[in-house]
Regions:
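Short, flexible loop/turn elements at secondary-structure junctions
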Residues: 3, 34, 152, 207-209
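Bacterial N-terminal signal peptides that target proteins for export
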Residues: 3-14
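Sec-dependent signal peptide cleavage junction
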Residues: 22-42
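Beta-strand-enriched, solvent-exposed domains that form extended recognition/catalytic surfaces
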Residues: 37-175
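Low-complexity, Pro/Ser/Thr- and charge-rich linker/hinge segments at domain boundaries
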Residues: 162-195
Length: 245
């Protein structure tokens, strides 16, 4: 395959969103009289409880994705698939994260997100760890989102984050709706990042960008992920065509 063709057929699977598609206005905050504030707070708390979405998960069945480097070589891709399996948990700088791995196989853990916390040339900012069966403690001076990677071909490894980590919005295709994402953003307005996960697509962006360029622009995250997945499928088919040509 020619270099130019390779460049045109890059297979993006992990997309760190810079989302700059739409412009939006600003919704002004409401002012209330002093005598109404107590009642307003009570109503707000009630609505928040009704609209809350349980996004915090600490037990994960980490799927085996195989060796992504081997897959890259077999399919002649310039950039390999993302091995990241998001947890929706954020590790603060130097925060100790205790993780329990069941079974007799090790997995990898990462703290930090490429092209979000660091560019592709700043690998040192993204910390990787080998998690052996049993209890493991990890930490990163930079902090970042926590991810797992199971190199096994198929199967799952149960992994539990026992202590550490802060919940952040994690939108999953087939599990959540646009309203769920809105509720997540309301629950965690100061989250380190927001992640949108499709079958083979992972988008990472700041809450401000997600709200501005998705929610306020009336873009459905479900349709956004489906479009990226269709684009990915097209690129894979095109790569197969070029490989067999």
């Amino acid at each position: 395959m020619k270099r130019g063709q390779q460049q045109k057929t890059k297979n993006l699977v992990m997309i760190t969103a810079t989302l700059s598609m739409f412009a939006t206005g600003i919704t002004p905050s409401l002012e209330v009289f002093a005598e109404e504030q107590a009642q307003q707070k009570k109503v707000s708390t009630t609505l928040q409880n009704e609209n809350s979405v349980n996004v915090e998960n600490r037990v994960f069945a980490v799927p085996g994705k195989g060796d992504v480097s081997q897959l890259q070589n077999i399919e002649r891709r310039e950039r390999n698939f993302s091995a990241y399996e998001p947890t929706g948990l954020y590790a603060k700088p130097n925060e100790q994260i205790t993780i329990q791995v069941q079974g007799n196989q090790s997995i990898q853990a990462y703290i930090g997100t490429f092209s979000f916390d660091a560019s592709w040339r700043e690998d040192s900012k993204i910390k990787s760890f080998t998690l052996n069966p049993g209890t493991n403690t990890i930490q990163s001076p930079n902090g970042g989102m926590i991810y797992f990677y199971n190199k096994q071909q198929g199967g799952t490894i149960q992994t539990t984050v026992i202590t550490g980590g802060t919940a952040t919005p994690l939108f999953e295709l087939g599990k959540h709706t646009k309203q769920d994402l809105i509720n997540m953003l309301n629950q965690y307005p100061n989250a380190h990042a927001v992640e949108l996960k499709g079958e083979r697509v992972l988008i990472t962006a700041s809450p401000v960008r997600v709200k501005k360029y998705l929610i306020d622009s009336n873009t459905d995250p479900v349709q956004l992920l489906k479009k990226w997945m269709r684009l990915l499928e097209f690129k894979i088919k095109y790569l197969d065509y070029l490989k067999n040509k």
